[in-house]
From Swiss-Prot:
GO BP terms: mRNA export from nucleus; nuclear export; protein export from nucleus; protein localization to kinetochore; ribosomal large subunit export from nucleus; ribosomal small subunit export from nucleus; tRNA export from nucleus; tRNA re-export from nucleus
Subcellular localization(s) per the UniProt record: Nucleus; Cytoplasm, Perinuclear region
GO cellular component: cytoplasm; kinetochore; nucleus; perinuclear region of cytoplasm; spindle pole body
Pfam families for this protein: CRM1_C (PF08767), CRM1_repeat (PF18777), CRM1_repeat_2 (PF18784), CRM1_repeat_3 (PF18787), IBN_N (PF03810), Xpo1 (PF08389)
Chain's role: Receptor for the leucine-rich nuclear export signal (NES).
Highest classification ranks of the organism: Eukaryota, Fungi, Dikarya, Ascomycota, Saccharomycotina
Gene name per UniProt: CRM1
Protein name: Exportin-1
Membrane-crossing segments per the record: none
Length: 1084
């Protein structure tokens, strides 16, 4: 086998074929050996010189594939280094090989894969050579198409591939300038390409040629100027001749979808007529040759084969694309009304198909339609509404806040919504019956048909629910009466059992919950009362735990969505809360969780109603809740109890009187405090009590209960924290010494034992409680005077002296919060924190990138906050420790954990800015001399490593800052050693030389001209982030390709920021429409 690795002699093709056969068909040791030899063969830099022999003389198609792969590698990486005659030789060889395979009918039929692979290699050459070195390629290709049907068919495939490579996949493989250049070259050749396609479609008889031509045309349609399409009769050909044949129907529909998406002028009547005509023809062909508009597509799809299912998906894409672009064209002509409604009727039928991706396609269109109809209603003149009409509407004004308008009133205006009345009514039903589960619902039916607690949230389902919800909200605004009637009648059929099923009651309840905020208050009151009464009746009526659990989850979801109604109807709110307390004793999995979640959700929106004394009540309801808390929470798990306490904390925070608030807090914490005081007393007398696992669980639970209440009460929690603070820190110390004793007795393995893990839970919860309070505290003087010193004494020395496995990352998190809130008030405290945790933590994480992941993240958060709030602390570090600090920052750059990487880059950026602010002082000068180039080289190291793409924006900012320091003359000392360069060399010149050397050593395949041109662009653009980032991005493409083009510098935009801005604008828009934001998303 090794014979093929001898590159000094001619290649033994037969031996190569044998090795390839062994690799593909053999097994065991021989197969492994063949794989190793083939890998070495392909990796040899001279392998490409053997490719032509393999392609000419090999009898094994797999060997030919390997030869083409070797050529691909050469073309993408080293093409520009080859002499011109070599390049032309390879080019002509590949073209000749493709043509000879096409001219042999037998080969053309049997070796399709090999011909395709050769086509791809040709396209790789084209990306390098065309148009500048091969300007006549497209005319030659078109000229050769008349030589034979096979050549013509393959030319279509090459054109398709070229379009895909240039237009669809160019983002990361080519620089921006190159991609733009190829696109411009392509657009000059449009006419010839289009003429060829048109000629074949008009005259061609070979079915496979027609399909290849349509596939090629498909790739070009979306950027061929529309006049080519509209000045010929190609639309007529597509929408009649090729729609009838089953072979071409699917690809033709895709082509028509592309045409539907073109931007056409609005003022050209001839083009408008053609646009309507091709749509009319297409629907007519579908109705007569494929399926009538009345067909039950849900059933058809379920029994169809793969091709027919794909066709229905393509039909949905065609209809939604065409109608989204050209709906207004059809709406404006009364004679096209039937066509318009038939198209939408097809879409209704397609929407009923049980296939999520297809449903999402139609749903996007429905969103487009109903939002459009809604905004037309919004533009109705408010002045038209006389006071009498306003009363009849059941809402105060036309503004969205007051709920949906009366449909009777809207009939007075010539609105587009009237055209779609029947379609919208059908759509309401489709959406209601296909509603997916909202994220608040925790009780679900699994694949086995059992009712269980749901643990995994699917982001796809959450997004789909959001879209469905928005469509249903618009539909409710368009006809609130129809929506209400459909929902109430479907609910009646749940009660009478005629439509009862878990799926049906769920989707209906989820739909009912999703339209909260769309109705006027009066309508909503009538509607919600009916719904909740019916659902409560169902819980009584239905037997069996599963049935009860399903209905309970639906009641809880619905009531959680209507806080406005609950706020206005105290008796109902009280009934609902008592029902939730009842569900808290229901042990079916998921029900108790959901009861607690719904309780806290309602409390967040209605908290004020619990702290005031309601009419006909003897006390505020929170007092009743606290008095019965033991009974209510008796069957709950600890985590659920914490949620309950957290909800009570939210209510108590709403009490305005400080004395009353403190009394309620004291009452709420009475049970946990009694247990706490008892345990503190007992464990002081008998410390071994803390080794009992039950006691440890109780203590951890008590502290977790405090954390829950503190989370919701924030600064108002101070009296309770004062009650337990000193004993808690004593406990922290006692537990720490116990852990140390266990480690001393049993070695490091002790940290993994249940006993020590239980003790560490106590420590972690204590830290969490203190951190939670300090993060929300307003009384910063008290925090400094009362809390900080005992905390640092209890925590820091223990952390430093512990074995690494017993150190808690929560210490770092807690210290981060202390520095964030009061670091500026305790300079010595910050220095103590740094001295205690910096070196010992760095020593835990500097051996690799994975051990102690939580410590890593928290460590860099702490350094970042100290850098921001208490920078002076770093200046107190001795030089050796400061060097470790810089090393730690550069170490963070190299992490794959995004938090660590981005924090590291931010620390570096803040540090450089802090040093700059110090001005021309010895410390700053020393810093620049010692560390400036470390930061430059380490930033370039991660910038050019594709594993660190996610840090690109921050890397660019840091590099910009470093370059600006030099080019704006902010550094007043030479950055080089005297012997390195001639005296008097400026920092600018030295930086350019340094970067040029560094980059040419790292990327020897780049020419000095490329590097000089990159650096020249970079050092001119350091004031404009967008341009600067574009230059860096282009450089990153260039380093992957040998012999790139030195003129390749343009810029690229950042998508992430655009997305954030889009989300912000969408939220602003949604806030103006009743019901578009969920109740939980609204500000109180």
């Amino acid at each position: 086998m090794e014979g093929i690795l001898d590159f000094s002699n001619d290649l033994d093709i037969a031996l190569l074929d044998q090795v390839v056969s062994t690799f593909y068909q053999g097994s065991g040791v021989q197969q492994k050996q063949a794989q190793e030899i083939l890998t070495k063969f392909q990796d040899n830099p001279d392998a490409w010189q053997k490719a032509d022999q393999i392609l000419q003389f090999s009898t094994n198609p797999q060997s030919k594939f390997i030869a083409l792969s070797i050529l691909d590698k050469l073309i993408t990486r080293k093409w520009k280094l080859l002499p011109n005659d070599h390049r032309i030789g390879i080019r002509n060889f590949v073209v000749g090989m493709i043509i000879s395979m096409c001219q042999d009918d037998e080969v053309f039929k049997t070796q399709k894969n090999l011909i395709n692979k050769s086509d791809l290699t040709l396209v790789q050459i084209l990306k390098q050579e065309w148009p500048q070195n091969w300007p006549e390629f497209i005319p030659e290709l078109i000229g050769s198409s008349s030589s034979s049907v096979n050549v013509c068919e393959n030319n279509m495939i090459v054109l398709k591939l070229l379009s895909e490579e240039v237009f669809d996949f160019s983002a990361e493989q080519m620089t921006q300038a190159k991609a733009l250049h190829l696109k411009n070259s392509m657009s000059k050749e449009f006419e010839q390409i289009f003429k060829l396609c048109f000629q074949v479609l008009e005259q061609g008889s070979s079915s496979s040629l027609i399909v290849a031509t349509l596939e090629s045309l498909l790739r070009y349609l979306h950027w061929i100027p529309y006049r080519y399409i509209y000045e010929t009769n190609i639309l007529e050909l597509l929408s009649t001749k090729f729609m009838t044949s089953p072979d071409t129907r699917a690809i033709t529909l895709k082509c028509l979808t592309e045409v539907s998406n073109l931007k056409i002028p609005q003022d050209n009547d001839l083009i408008k007529r053609q646009t309507v005509l091709f749509f009319q023809n297409t629907l007519q062909q579908i109705a007569t040759s494929v399926m009538p508009v009345t067909a039950d597509l849900k059933a058809t799809y379920a029994n169809a084969n793969g091709n027919d299912q794909s066709f229905l998906q393509d039909l949905a894409m065609f209809l939604t694309t065409y109608l989204a672009r050209n709906r207004a064209l059809l709406e404006s002509d009364e004679s096209l009304r039937e066509l318009l409604l038939n198209a939408h009727q097809y879409l209704i039928q397609l929407s009923k198909i049980e296939e999520r991706e297809l449903f999402k396609t139609t749903l996007d269109y429905w969103h487009n339609l109903v939002a459009d109809l809604f905004y037309e209603v919004q533009r109705l003149p408010a002045t038209e509404m006389s006071p009498l009409i306003q009363l009849s509407v059941g809402s105060q004004a036309i503004s969205t806040g007051s709920g949906a308008l009366n449909p009777e009133y809207m009939k007075r205006f010539p609105l587009k919504k009237h055209i779609y009345e029947e379609i919208c009514s059908q759509l309401r039903l489709v959406i209601i019956e296909n509603m997916v589960r909202p994220e608040e619902v925790l009780v679900v039916e699994n694949d086995e048909g059992e009712i269980v607690r749901e643990f995994v949230k699917e982001s796809d389902t959450i997004q789909l629910y959001k879209s469905e919800r928005e469509v249903l909200v618009y539909l409710t605004h368009l006809n609130v009466i129809d929506t209400e009637e459909i929902m109430i009648s479907k609910l009646a059929r749940q009660i009478d059992g005629s439509e009862w099923s878990w799926h049906n009651i769920n989707t209906l309840s989820w739909a009912i919950g999703s339209i909260s905020g769309t109705m006027s208050e009066d309508t909503e009151k009538r509607f919600v009362v009916t719904v909740i009464k019916d659902l409560l009746d169902l819980t009584v009526k239905k037997r069996g735990k599963d049935n009860k659990a399903v209905v309970a989850s639906d009641i809880m979801y619905v009531v959680g969505q209507y806080p406005r109604f609950l706020k206005a109807h105290w008796n109902f709110l009280r009934t609902v809360i008592l029902k939730l307390f009842e569900f808290m004793h229901e042990t079916h999995e998921g029900v108790q969780d959901m009861a607690c979640d719904t309780f806290i959700k309602i409390v967040q929106k209605c908290k004020y109603h619990f702290v005031i004394q309601q009419p006909r009540e003897s006390e505020p309801f929170i007092q009743t809740i606290i008095r019965d808390i033991q009974k209510t929470t008796a069957d709950l798990q600890p985590q659920q109890v914490h949620t309950f306490y957290k909800a009570c904390g939210i209510i108590i925070s709403e009490e305005r009187s400080v004395a009353e608030r403190n009394r309620l807090l004291s009452d709420l914490m009475q049970l946990p405090n009694m247990a706490w005081d008892t345990i503190v007393e007992q464990s002081t007398a008998n410390p071994t009590l803390l080794l009992d696992s039950e006691t440890v669980k109780i203590i951890a639970n008590i502290i977790k209960t405090n954390v829950a209440v503190c989370t919701s009460m924030g600064a108002d929690f101070y009296p309770q924290l004062g009650h337990i603070y000193y004993n808690m820190l004593q406990l922290y110390r006692a537990v720490s010494s116990m852990i140390s004793a266990q480690v001393a007795a049993e070695g490091l393995i002790a940290t993994k034992t249940p006993k020590v893990r239980g003790l560490r839970t106590i420590k972690k919860e204590i830290l969490k409680l203190v951190e939670t309070y300090i993060s929300k505290a307003r009384n910063l003087d008290d925090v400094v005077k009362v809390l900080v010193e005992p905390l640092l004494n209890a925590v820091l020395e223990d952390y430093m002296n512990n074995v690494p496995d017993a150190r808690d990352a929560e210490v770092l998190n807690c210290m981060t919060t202390v520095v964030e809130k009061v670091g500026h008030m305790i300079p010595q405290g910050v220095i103590l924190i740094l001295q205690s945790v910096f070196e010992c933590t760095l020593d835990m994480i500097n051996k690799d990138f994975t051990e102690y992941p939580e410590h890593r993240v928290e460590f860099y958060k702490l350094l970042k906050v100290i850098n921001e709030k208490s920078f002076a602390a770093f200046l107190e570090l001795p030089p050796a420790a400061f060097k470790l600090f810089v090393d730690a920052i550069c170490w963070a750059f190299k992490h794959n954990n995004r938090d660590v990487e981005v924090n590291g880059l931010q620390i570096a950026l803040d540090l450089v800015k802090n040093i700059e602010r110090m001005g021309n002082v010895p410390f700053a000068n020393e810093f620049h001399k010692n560390y400036f180039f470390i930061f430059v080289s380490e930033t370039f190291f991660v910038l050019t490593d594709s594993d660190h793409k996610s840090g690109f924006s921050k890397q660019a900012l840091l590099l910009m800052k470093l370059i600006s320091l030099v080019y704006d003359n902010k550094i007043s000392v030479p950055l080089y050693q005297e012997a390195e360069v001639p005296q008097g060399t400026s920092n600018q010149v030295y930086l350019s030389q340094y970067l040029a050397n560094m980059l040419s050593n790292a990327f020897p395949h780049l020419t000095s001209e490329q590097i000089a041109s990159f650096l020249s662009a970079l050092t001119k653009q350091y004031k404009d982030l967008v341009v600067f980032k574009g230059t860096l991005r282009d450089f990153l493409v260039q380093i992957k390709e040998v012999g790139g083009d030195p003129t390749d510098y343009l810029f690229a935009e950042d998508k992430e920021n655009a997305l954030m801005e889009q989300n912000r604008l969408e939220r602003e828009k949604a806030a103006k429409i009743g019901g578009l934001l969920k109740p939980s998303e609204l500000d109180d």
